[in-house]
Amino acid sequence: MLIDKYLPAYQFNEFHSVELTGYLDGIYQKMLQCDFSNSSLIKFLFRIRGMSKEVYSIEHLTKMGFIKLDEDPGSEILFGMVTDNPMFNNCQLIVSSKEFIQQTDDTIIKAVINFKLQNKSSSQHIISTETRVWCGSKTIKSKFKFYWFFIKPFSQLIRKSMLKQIKTQIQQAAKLN
């Protein structure tokens, strides 16, 4: 998994998945292009977290300060960010995947989020998302832990809602074909 390559060690994580059944074409591309703009819950949660109103698909995560670190087309896409602020207000400009891996300063926080498609069979599929956070020191970890305590429930709601939207839109598209 790409996420293991870029952030194998971490102190915080969150994992969610959804299962799809049926003979579905183009699942990965539909996952990336899923339109979250019709989800009032996602828009509301993005707004209260101070996130960009323009994040309407997985591919738009770059508008929130993430960079696309890597992709295994048809299987997994990975985004990451580096910051020295536990609330992720000031993301450092990371221009390459290599630079992301090399950053190990004790004043930073590195975060990654992936979206992954696993085909269990031709008619059974799992879409998952995992978020991992690495803190460079005990001091920054304790600051982030306080933030995570309050934000984690909202983060979980966002991820679960995203997966629900992806599943719904993929199944609706399959019915139209």
Segments predicted by a language model, with ranges:
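Hydrophobic ligand-binding cavity/cleft-lining segments
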Residues: 1-60, 65-74
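A conserved amphipathic terminal alpha-helix motif
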Residues: 143-177
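Hydrophobic residues positioned within well-ordered beta-strands of beta-sheet architectures
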Residues: 14-16, 111-113, 127
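Short acidic, glycine/tyrosine-flanked loop/strand segments centered on an H-E-D-like triad
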Residues: 123-145
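Hydrophobic pocket/interface hotspot
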Residues: 27-28, 129, 166
